[in-house]
């Protein structure tokens, strides 16, 4: 089998390919996959991974790392909005700047765009109307299960999976929120004064360090 990554852009401009199986079989298709793969400065985004389902295994871990990436971005957004009080315009600017440096990536880029999308059926931006409930295809869970089987710590990826589980419990979360409010536990974070520029820089550094951890955990599983 062969893992494929790249989405719509990959289909148009070349994907990242992770072929597995026998090396003899790979040699038959090597010329083809090298040509259709995405091309970067140091060569095509394809390499022979190994026997059997090794290619699909790497793709599974790739998705697990991406789970971690998305959760880290979500938490960075939450801190900037909830603690820093950044507007969607300011969030868009911050993520746009981040995408010019060490955090440059597809996920950071599209996140910056999301903040600027207007709600064509109401006021404000669409990001504030998105249902805070997510689903999953299973590859993140498989990655965490495999890490456990191998006795390998993957806390960032595992925490991102837990967050998805909690995300699905919307009714329970809303009920718990009412209990907290009835107990007099309000939103004290909104009363905190912070230096926005300092917070943006601190969150950028924290996000970068956390992403390195997520990638390291995935590579350790492989």
In which residue ranges do the predicted regions lie?
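Solvent-exposed, charged interface segments at domain starts and junctions
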Residues: 93-98, 156-160
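Rossmann-fold dinucleotide-binding core
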Residues: 1-93, 100-125, 129, 167-194
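A conserved active-site cap/scaffold subdomain adjacent to cofactor or substrate pockets
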Residues: 126-214
């Amino acid at each position: 089998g062969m893992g494929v990554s790249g989405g719509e852009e990959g289909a148009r401009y070349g994907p990242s390919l992770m072929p597995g199986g026998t090396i003899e079989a790979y040699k038959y298709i090597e010329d083809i996959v090298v040509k259709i793969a995405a091309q970067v400065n140091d060569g095509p985004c394809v390499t022979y991974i190994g026997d059997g389902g090794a290619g699909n295994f790497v793709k599974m871990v790739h998705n697990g790392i991406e789970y971690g990436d998305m959760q880290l971005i979500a938490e960075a957004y939450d801190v900037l909005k909830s603690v820093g009080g950044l507007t969607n315009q300011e969030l868009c600017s911050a993520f746009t700047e981040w995408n010019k440096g060490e955090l440059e990536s597809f996920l950071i880029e599209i996140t910056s765009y999301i903040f600027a999308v207007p709600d064509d059926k109401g006021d404000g931006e669409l990001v504030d109307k998105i249902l805070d409930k997510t689903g999953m295809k299973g590859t993140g869970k498989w990655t965490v299960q495999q890490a456990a089987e191998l006795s390998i710590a993957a806390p960032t990826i595992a925490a991102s999976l837990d967050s998805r589980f909690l995300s699905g419990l919307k009714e329970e979360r809303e009920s718990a929120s009412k209990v907290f409010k009835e107990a007099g536990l309000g939103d004290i974070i909104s009363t905190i004064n912070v230096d926005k520029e300092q917070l943006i820089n601190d969150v950028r550094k924290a996000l970068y360090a956390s992403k390195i951890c997520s990638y390291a955990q995935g590579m350790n599983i492989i």
